[in-house]
Amino acid sequence: MASQSPKCLMLYSTTDGHTKTIMDTIARQLADETKVRCDVVDIKDGNSYVLADYEKVLLGASIRYGHFSAAFINYVKQHHSELSAMPSAFFSVNLTARKLDKNTATTNVYTRKFLNQSSWSPQLVGVFAGALWYPRYNFFDRVLIQFIMKVTGGETDSTKEIVYTDWAAVRRFASDFAALPLAVPPRPKANTVEKPDGILRSGSGAHCLLAIVGMSAAVIVGIRIIAAKRG
């Protein structure tokens, strides 16, 4: 009797759907090239799946306004021991990674901070640029993201939809994930080269300031629109 194909659990946390698109792309490549059986699952439903039933696990999560989703953070906290005991990998998705000096685990502040604070030590980490969907955002998100993009030198045309993802990098990551050995050797905490705390706090503070200013801008614009309608 033929042996069953290896199974891979692929859990994603997405804000606007693009992280799932990336995960689906990786799953298709694995299925085509290695015949691995891939279960692509929203991490909100992750607890319905038993990690011990899989040979490998991949987690992918988007970042919005500097934060991963609560569902993603809670899942990792709950299952970090199981994740570290099996072949596991992780990728984050954020617009900051559109910049070449912000698209690795050591240079992307959000990813680096998460890994340094997490008890989980994935064997493989990727950072991918996300997508900008101005027409699909609600008013608040559109104004705030537009403001952040202006401050960071990005696209501010609210009619644009832009995918910044480097698909070649995604394919390389998929190949590296497929190559992870099934046996997990003891390993130290992943070396993400954390910068001094002051720098991290400064970076986080800057993003908080951007969020506050952006929210203020959104409120002001909303008030002006309401006032104009009443007038």
From Swiss-Prot:
It is found in: Membrane. Binds 1 FMN non-covalently per subunit. It comes from the Eukaryota. Pathway: Porphyrin-containing compound metabolism; protoporphyrin-IX biosynthesis; protoporphyrin-IX from protoporphyrinogen-IX: step 1/1. The keyword Calcium does not apply. One of its GO terms (molecular function) is FMN binding. Residues 8-178 form the Flavodoxin-like domain. It is a single-pass membrane protein. The chain crosses the membrane at residues 208-228. It catalyses: protoporphyrinogen IX + 3 a menaquinone = protoporphyrin IX + 3 a menaquinol; protoporphyrinogen IX + 3 a ubiquinone = protoporphyrin IX + 3 a ubiquinol; protoporphyrinogen IX + 3 a quinone = protoporphyrin IX + 3 a quinol. FMN binds at residues 14-18, 90-158. Keywords: Flavoprotein, FMN, Membrane, Nucleotide-binding, Oxidoreductase, Porphyrin biosynthesis, Transmembrane, Transmembrane helix. GO terms for biological process: heme biosynthetic process; protoporphyrinogen IX biosynthetic process. InterPro entries: Flavodoxin_dom, Flavoprotein-like_sf, HemG, Protoporphyrinogen_IX_DH. NCBIfam families: PRK11104.1 (NF008316). Belongs to the HemG family. Leishmania is not able to completely synthesize heme; it is thought that the amastigote form localized in macrophages utilizes coproporphyrinogen from the host to produce heme via the successive action of HemF, HemG and HemH. This is Protoporphyrinogen IX dehydrogenase [quinone]. It comes from Leishmania major.
